[in-house]
Structures are given as structure tokens and as C-alpha cells.
Regions:
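RNA substrate-binding interface of SAM-dependent RNA methyltransferases
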Residues: 38, 92-177
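Amphipathic alpha-helical repeat scaffolds
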Residues: 29, 106-114, 222-228
Length: 243
């Protein structure tokens, strides 16, 4: 059974302010919880139904009913467990390979998908400016399906980082060179912008190349692609050229 203090802690961690203050975050769902445990994240609290608890030998568990779990979960259909882990502090940014950079991406689902995308394509470093949604937002963590354990997410002064970065910088925009005729080096930074406004003028000015995904529709009336979709297309093309 959950204590009042445990309930209050879970509620607090829905807010970025308290996640940063306490250096904690929430993970929901059996698969994701197991992945964070296996990745060695330090556990603060684990609540689970009896069904899930039987698979977690050796872990300190607070047993709850499905109804109790439902009351503290942010999901419509909670999946047998909720855990609180300590945030992991990543070391310095290694400037090699393909790096993905995000300029003010706001939607948790988009960031979660982009983290999964990095994991799938072997991109280990994701750079975000401070206005990009928090990677420890519960909706982001849920959308990553455990991929957050394998991708280092860094929040930095993006313009400052790009200004001193030694790798070629390619920013995605509607007005740029054709993605499919661009030759990318093995090591580079791919920059994606805000869902509504794209990349900022400051970041655009720092880019070595501006790249666009060409439209093939006859009427050419589609305004833009979802940022996660665009990211998938771009990274896939870069990896294709690597091979």
C-alpha cells in the first residue's frame, strides 16, 4: 500500500521543477521499468501489482492493487507497475559519428520518438536546447519505450555548442538543398527545429548546409512533415550513405 508521502512524490514528479530539484523521474510499464533496472539506473521507488512483482526477484517493491496504481498513474491503462529512478548525469559530449540536435522541439511524443529513432540508428548523442521538452517528462519516457537508457541526452546552449563544434552542421528546413542529392560525411550534426517555426535564425546562421526533404505530390500543397517523421527520413538517408 502506498503512503501519503509516496503519492505526493509521484504527483510532484509530473512537474519539471520537482524532477530537476529532486533529480528523479518516473517510468511506467513493465518493459520500460525492466530496461532501466537492467541499465543500472539507481532505483528510488518501485510499486507493482502482485503479477509484476513475481518477475522482479530481489527488488524492493511496494505492492499495490490495480486500483491504487490507476490513481497515481498518468496512463489511461496502467501496465502493472510504476518506478521512480535517479536521473543519470552524462559526461562531456563526444564529437564523433552522427549527432542529432533539436532546436526547441516541444511535443513529448515527438521527443520520445526521436530518442527511439536515435537508438534504432545507433546515434548515441542527442543535443537539445533548453527550450526543448524535458527528456524526463513522463510522456517522453513512456514514448521512448526504454531507448532513453541507450541515448545520452544533453541540454545545452545550442547556439554556443554549434558555434564551437568541429563537425559539419546540417540544418533541416523547407528551403534548402535536396536531401537525396546531398553527400553527408561520416561524422556530422543533423539539426531539427520547432514543430511550428522550424530552426531559429541564430541556429540557421551557424549551419554549413541547409537541407530539405523534397515533396513528390503533384499539387505540392502539404505544408510540412511532423518533426519526428522528418528526422526518421533524414537519419535513414544518412545511414544509407554510410553503408
Amino acid at each position: 500500500m502506498l503512503s501519503k508521502n509516496q503519492v505526493k512524490l509521484i504527483q510532484k514528479l509530473q512537474q519539471k521543477k520537482y524532477r530537476n530539484e529532486l533529480n528523479l523521474f518516473i517510468v511506467e510499464g513493465k518493459k520500460s521499468i525492466v530496461e532501466f533496472l537492467q541499465a543500472g539506473y539507481r532505483l528510488e521507488l518501485l510499486i507493482a501489482t502482485e503479477v509484476f512483482a513475481t518477475a522482479l526477484n530481489g527488488q524492493p517493491i511496494t505492492l499495490v492493487s490495480k486500483e491504487e496504481l490507476r490513481k497515481v498513474s498518468s496512463l489511461k491503462n496502467p501496465d502493472e507497475g510504476l518506478a521512480i529512478f535517479h536521473q543519470r548525469q552524462h559526461k562531456g559530449i563526444l564529437q564523433e559519428g552522427v549527432i542529432l540536435a533539436l532546436d526547441n522541439v516541444q511535443d513529448p511524443g515527438n521527443l520520445g520518438t526521436l530518442i527511439r529513432l536515435c537508438d534504432w540508428f545507433g546515434i548515441e548523442t542527442l543535443i537539445c536546447n533548453s527550450q526543448t521538452v524535458d527528456c524526463y517528462n513522463p510522456k517522453v519516457v513512456q514514448a521512448t519505450m526504454g531507448s532513453l537508457t541507450r541515448v545520452a541526452v544533453h541540454y545545452v546552449d545550442l547556439a554556443g555548442f554549434l558555434a564551437t563544434c568541429t563537425l559539419p552542421l546540417y540544418a533541416m528546413d523547407l528551403d534548402g538543398e535536396n536531401l537525396y542529392t546531398t553527400e553527408f560525411p561520416e561524422d556530422c550534426v543533423l539539426i531539427l527545429g520547432n514543430e511550428a517555426n522550424g530552426i531559429s535564425l541564430e541556429v540557421r546562421a551557424l549551419a554549413d548546409g541547409i537541407i530539405t526533404i523534397p515533396r513528390f505530390g503533384k499539387l505540392q500543397q502539404t505544408e510540412s512533415l511532423n518533426v519526428a517523421m522528418a528526422g526518421a527520413i533524414v537519419v535513414s538517408q544518412v545511414r544509407k550513405l554510410d553503408n
